[in-house]
């Protein structure tokens, strides 16, 4: 069987999905999970784009051991320098730079305003420049699927001659059909001089729902590497979903003689961790990881599954690490039991972080008695978020009822400074938001508000993820509590703190400016 490399770009392209931003600590923990999952390469970010992106790539590179860590760069000298600075301490055989430039007519005319020869010269110059610092260089022709094939062949030929070790073919806007994308890969395999000496990679977007199908067609026509994201997250409609591509190869190995290094029993835990970190919940009918995948409502289906699971299931829940045993721990559980449970899901924490998780676990166990898997994922993702020592909710009081005008009073504190306010609203959540606005003198616009249960049962926690627009910019916040009003207030304050820090109105170590 032919081995297919899995290039995971959850931390880079996946994070570009609206609302999916991750802190440095969250990226590091997700990278450790991806390493355990068995991916071959991890694209950790775009270092030149921001100090946070640079730090994330640098930290991921120092945290993981086995995968090749990749940084993204345009065909621009400062981009390449930034990737090198972020990855220079990593062994040469475990670091890669991914350089790209658009090649399609529409990009040449409207975005780059360059002629073909100018683009070829940039490829020659900057792939060569990257090669001075990296043994492993991936080159992508952005929007390859809408590029004239003769020019695409010339672009890849130029990149290989300049030192590229991987050639990546992106279907950037998810435009290609499987048969034509497969034919394109075959044409490149046969027509690009030197391509037999490099990896041939594909990067498919899901705008027409064909990212996985196009990736499979590419592999069937000679691709040796597939770029994916967990849960298929990514810009617009997302990317080729890791879990779908890998499980198709596993379930249909009778027709697809390819294998990967993915430990499929860690797919579901990895998916759940990402969900809790980003707040992006896969649809219930999402293949492989959706909540409905192993549920059967039809009486005929239920009868068949009870008699023999394979009547209506082509894979077992255990194949992806999914267990029906969701109740895990309680108030009398100790550190050893908690650590063992976390490690069974591939979650490895340093001692300081684990201690914080344990403290929050014991607090939660005292409040709701029974702690479920999703509770643990939520606690871990909460602890991993970079601490923002801004305003904290010290006290709140809500007065509401079906015959009363809902009112809320809040006390907020940052450093030694306290602010108090009370307001009425259209419901308790609206009232507490307005009280916070009044206390801080800010008027955000609520763009998105999502609440979901964490765990099961009447005493489940509520997790709130929201997005605020403040002065034209978006800021996300997240809060978890057994009280949904409190969870909402925590998330709201979290988003406002991000705005205040970004604008220099609040010091990161606490205190208003």
Curated annotation (Swiss-Prot):
Single GO MF annotation: 2-isopropylmalate synthase activity
Transmembrane residue ranges: none
Name of the protein: 2-isopropylmalate synthase
SMART domains on file: LeuA_dimer
Catalytic activity: 3-methyl-2-oxobutanoate + acetyl-CoA + H2O = (2S)-2-isopropylmalate + CoA + H(+)
This protein's UniProt keywords: Amino-acid biosynthesis, Branched-chain amino acid biosynthesis, Cytoplasm, Leucine biosynthesis, Manganese, Metal-binding, Transferase
Gene that encodes it: leuA
Cell compartment(s), UniProt: Cytoplasm
InterPro entries for the chain: 2-IPM_HCS-like, 2-isopropylmalate_synth_dimer, AIPM/Hcit_synth_CS, Aldolase_TIM, LeuA/HCS_post-cat, LeuA_allosteric_dom_sf, LeuA_bact_synth, PYR_CT
